[in-house]
């Protein structure tokens, strides 16, 4: 187990075959993976606003992202409602090439667990909603 102040930046996975694997549910044993994932996101903050655990080779449903300037960690996130479909383009740190066309929802309601594995519900809108949809897609093996 690492010390609290120790930062662990993990190598990124770029293989689309691996990234297309669905992730398994996360549990309390994945909290350290979430910390590594956040450290890795912060190390790439100039070019990345969100990451899923499969991007560092861990196939568990763990997501970290920048939500309007505050980093959030979500375990087992799932979208339970959405509205306001729109077309956009997104890039991905794990995929080579430029932005790709995709569709997202302006507003999403997400059920997830926090680090204590307590179930939470939260509504996200705008860019945070877009980021989170991208990362949840990663958990489900969906690539843009």
Located regions from the model:
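Positively charged
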Residues: 1-144
């Amino acid at each position: 187990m690492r010390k609290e102040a120790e930062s662990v930046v993990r190598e990124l996975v770029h293989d689309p075959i691996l990234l297309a694997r669905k992730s398994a549910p996360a549990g309390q044993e994945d909290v350290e993976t979430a910390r590594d994932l956040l450290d890795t996101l912060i190390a790439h903050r100039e070019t990345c606003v969100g990451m899923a655990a499969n991007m560092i080779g861990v196939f568990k449903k763990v997501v970290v992202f920048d939500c309007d300037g505050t980093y959030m960690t979500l375990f087992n996130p799932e979208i339970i409602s959405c509205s306001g479909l729109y077309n956009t383009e997104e890039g991905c740190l794990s995929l080579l090439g430029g932005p790709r066309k995709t569709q997202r929802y302006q507003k999403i309601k997400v059920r997830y667990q926090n680090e204590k594995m307590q179930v939470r519900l939260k509504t996200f809108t705008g860019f945070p909603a877009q980021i989170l949809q991208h990362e949840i897609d990663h958990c489900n093996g969906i690539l843009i």
